[in-house]
Amino acid sequence: MNQSNTRLRQLCLCFCAVLTAVLLWRWQRIFYLMCADYIRSDMPAHVQLALSHNDYGLSSYLIRFLWGLRGEHFGQTALSLVLTANQLFGIFTLWLLLRHWLPELEGAFAWLAVLLAHLCGPWILPGQSEMYLGVYNGNVYHNMTVLFSRSFIPLDLLLFARLWESRRGKLPPKTWLGFALSLLVTTLFKPSFFVAFAPVALALLVWDFIKTRARGVVSELLLGLAFLPAAGALLWSYMALFAGEFAGTESHMILRRLTPAWLGWTLVMYLRGLLLPLYSFFTQGRRETRQRERLGIFAAVNAVAIAEAIFLTETGFRANDGNFDWGCLSLYTAVFSLAIGLLFRMGQQPAKGDARQRLRLAVGLALLLGHLVIGVYCLSRPGRAGYDWFYF
């Protein structure tokens, strides 16, 4: 049995190495086509804003630095390589987080789960044919700011979890500083995650304060202070994006006007995108009793992000940008990494002749296959004749 497991682990490592190389090659090609404006994306607009000194995030400074080195063509190539390296960094940080969530899942299979999560897309249903835009699909290659922030989000969640689990004693200074810096960088690239994460963290701190009758108030205050730099970055982003100077007009946040038809469409959209995560969470997630608090915090953050996407919107020149969607979209690969990791954990547990467990595993694998088919199709299309993201 041990020899069989060792061989399976070796095969998994070899497959992961090949798949990682293929993904990096494909991503670099996609990013270059976008940077050079061969296929439609948000990147040319980001470049134009950055070169015009309309700064609204770290990506603006990165663009100006790369374009200032050796001109436009070098900048386009360099940015595509930086984005590709960022994808690899995001895979690594998400692997660390998944190992924290599911420590009994072997490292090779955790890496495979993260890779497959980057290939998943929403299921296609009759009458609901969209695959990329207008759906819950987190592999949003057309927007660089969410790609950069998404790579740091696993560090935010991991370091916060370590601080939260240390709150009964002295908080580790290096972990506290690392969390504050990571959350600041995430927010400077894209503030959407902070808007979803901060309310959950505040609720946890208030709940703990009441539960312990203020016995851990010092640690709770210190943990709350770690959010202040990112809160300042959020305020700066708000002033840059919503002030009249940015586009000659104003934009505001309001509650969305909900209709039964729109709510029905939204429910179908999220179900299409979350079939496997919902299935894995309710079949296997409840069995991970030792990780219940960790998984529960992440589920709460994702639920708040989805609620913000449903109930909040913008007016003015940003009315149709869908910027409150980015919070839950930036968590997409983390959601699917956890879902696939739970599916692998289901396969790790001996069935002992239990036909129901084998059936549950087979259903999960079928759901995963459906997500993978769409994700691979979307990833394969850029560069083909007549291709445009918005044809989805």
Where are these regions (language model features)?
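Short hydrophobic alpha-helices at membrane interfaces in multi-pass membrane enzymes
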Residues: 159-184
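Transmembrane helical bundles and short interhelical boundary loops of multi-pass, membrane-embedded
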Residues: 231-234, 239-392
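Perimembrane helix-loop-helix junctions
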Residues: 170, 197-228, 254
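Membrane-interface alpha helices of multi-pass inner-membrane proteins
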Residues: 175-191, 197, 202
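Transmembrane-helix motifs of polytopic, lipid-linked glycan transferases
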Residues: 81-105, 155
